[in-house]
Amino acid sequence: MGKQSMKAREAKRAKLVAKFAEKRAALKVLISDVNASEEERWDAVLKLQSLPRDSSASRQRNRCNQTGRPHGYLRKFGLSRIKVREACMKGEIPGLRKASW
């Protein structure tokens, strides 16, 4: 089980990413705009750097919804491989069954 504090930290990061997404995108467009002046682009870089670190999407980590496990995460189910296997064996996931060939 992942610590509750780690789960809370990830939830906080998700909120920050959503809050600053538009602002970040606008600044990145301005930074990559070759028609903008160097001064405007540099100001945009400084503004981007002044945003909270956790508002960057790359700081988020996918975690299992049940256990908080960060590794072996399967996006399709939102669970770790271990919990997917357990649910599969119990028949809780429709259409999913153990492979046999």
Curated annotation (Swiss-Prot):
Record-level GO cellular component terms: cytoplasm; small ribosomal subunit
Gene3D superfamilies xref list: 1.10.287.1480
Gene Ontology MF terms: rRNA binding; structural constituent of ribosome
Any GO BP: translation
Keywords carried by this UniProt record: Ribonucleoprotein, Ribosomal protein, RNA-binding, rRNA-binding
Name of a matching Pfam family: Ribosomal_S14
Record SUPFAM superfamilies: Glucocorticoid receptor-like (DNA-binding domain)
Highest taxon of source: Bacteria
Family note: Belongs to the universal ribosomal protein uS14 family.
Function (record text): Binds 16S rRNA, required for the assembly of 30S particles and may also be responsible for determining the conformation of the 16S rRNA at the A site.
Assembly notes: Part of the 30S ribosomal subunit. Contacts proteins S3 and S10.
Protein name stated in the entry: Small ribosomal subunit protein uS14
Protein's organism: Aliivibrio fischeri (strain ATCC 700601 / ES114)
Taxonomy of the source species: Bacteria, Pseudomonadati, Pseudomonadota, Gammaproteobacteria, Vibrionales
